[in-house]
Amino acid sequence: MKLELRGITKRFGPLTANDSINLTIEEGHIHALLGENGAGKSTLMNVLYGMHQPDEGQILIDGVPVTFKGPGDAVAAGIGMVHQHFMLIPVFTVAESIALGFEPTGPAGIISRERARKTVREVSARFGFDLDPDALIEDLPVGAQQRVEIVKALSRQAKVLILDEPTAVLTPQETDELMTIMRQLADSGTSIVFITHKLREVRAVADEIT
């Protein structure tokens, strides 16, 4: 899936966060958005994810203009996002976290926990994640919690995955593991948007830099 942003402008009152931004994200590439805090990187991705509406400009998927009125529209179009601050509930299990908001249902619409567990196992096996579907989120290290967020996006068929400052809370070892995961995802055809201000990490993993 090829994703394009053309002339995206986003204002908040008198402040212009994004001024006529053009960006192309190619299929299977890791595209880094490099810049200091406050540069407008996260705002631009929130526009792409449907959390903000652009004041000007267009989003195109495979050359076709699309409009996202909310994150649900972006998810349906194949876009996933892992926020810097994870959107997880500590007392939920991994499987419950994956199912939340997108519940695999059984007969009569009842949530199928086994189906949710199966999803975790399948996606984890595909990318070499070590995730126990029945583990509680609050018992997982930060790196594993981040993988839960990635699995959650992939289980919704994300073809473009936005990672917002993903290494900010990781140890050096967890950062190296994430770099490996990103490359595996890209090699499988998933496009990665890597928001960061760390040049060393960009040099290590990015195919393109903006």
Where are these regions (language model features)?
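Glycine-rich phosphate-binding loops of nucleotide-dependent enzymes
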Residues: M1-T210
